[in-house]
Amino acid sequence: MINIDIFIKGKFIRIFQIICNLINSLKANKFERDLIRISYNYKFHNQSKYSLWNTLNTFNKVYKKNIEGSIVECGVWQGINLVLFQKLIEEYSLDSCKIYGFDTFEGTPNPTKEDITKYNELMKDEYERLKKKDNTSGWNNASMDVVKNN
């Protein structure tokens, strides 16, 4: 049986994300719109357009403030954000900017009872559903070779 509160909350979140995607698309330049479209269409991505726009907007805040330094991503999964950052660095000729991706390449750790989804459901249930036969996480697990190939 569907919990109506969770259902309505999920629909509201989805509508909010669609509106934000539209606003972001209207504010973006052609390169940024194309970058989000291309990134979203990579076979190895698992992010929503909303998440990709948030990543791009965060990058732009740092870039427009002329903050120098490197980009660090902790937990790269299959590397979609690393690809996104590399394309941004190339586009804006940020030759001194380096990208560092850190990951255990062992998947997501076992969630606790405090870890819940945006729909207020236990993440542990999803984790258990995706667990491999050898009792390791099958959740967001990608090898270093997969990331390098992407």
Positions of the model-derived regions?
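Membrane-proximal basic amphipathic "stem/tether" segments
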Residues: 1-45
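Short, functional N-terminal and low-complexity linear motifs
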Residues: 20-27, 50-56, 114
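Conserved alpha-helix/loop element of class I SAM-dependent methyltransferases that forms part
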Residues: 54-66
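A broadly tuned "polar low-complexity/structure-edge" signature
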Residues: 2-11, 59, 76-79, 86
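S-adenosylmethionine/decaboxylated-SAM
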Residues: 29-49, 65-150
